[in-house]
């Protein structure tokens, strides 16, 4: 009987220790996930929205619904006759087509 009681106490102790370790791991994972979300939110605040100028930061465009916007550049001739490059964040045509197909698929299949 003493052996069963000792074994039971040992089992309860090990179980409580392992569950405490698991809870610590979950808490650490929650903290890491929260920090990751905060960092992503900060990066989102610093990104350049759609149709805004990205000439100085060509890799800083925000994310769209499915894809990240791309910095699209064109050459513009000013009134003085000088050619300059102007860029804006936008959705490339192949991304627009993919978003259209996905949207159409969602409407059909729910």
From Swiss-Prot:
It comes from Lycosa singoriensis. Keywords: Disulfide bond, Knottin, Secreted, Signal, Toxin. It is found in: Secreted. Disulfide bonds join 47-62, 54-71, 61-89, 73-87. Its main location: secreted. The presence of a 'disulfide through disulfide knot' structurally defines this protein as a knottin. Expressed by the venom gland. Residues 21-44 form a propeptide. GO terms for cellular component: extracellular region. This is U1-lycotoxin-Ls1ii. Residues 1-20 form the signal peptide. Belongs to the neurotoxin 19 (CSTX) family. 03 subfamily. GO terms for molecular function: toxin activity.
């Amino acid at each position: 009987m003493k052996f069963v009681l000792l074994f039971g106490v040992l089992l309860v102790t090990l179980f409580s220790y392992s569950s405490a370790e698991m809870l610590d791991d979950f808490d650490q994972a929650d903290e890491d996930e929260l920090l990751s979300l905060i960092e992503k939110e900060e990066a989102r605040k610093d990104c350049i929205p759609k149709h805004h100028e990205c000439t100085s930061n060509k890799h800083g465009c925000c994310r769209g619904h499915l894809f990240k916007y791309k910095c699209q550049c064109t050459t513009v001739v000013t009134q003085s006759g000088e050619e300059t490059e102007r860029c804006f964040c936008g959705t490339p045509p192949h991304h627009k087509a993919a978003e259209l197909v996905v949207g159409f698929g969602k409407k059909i299949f729910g």
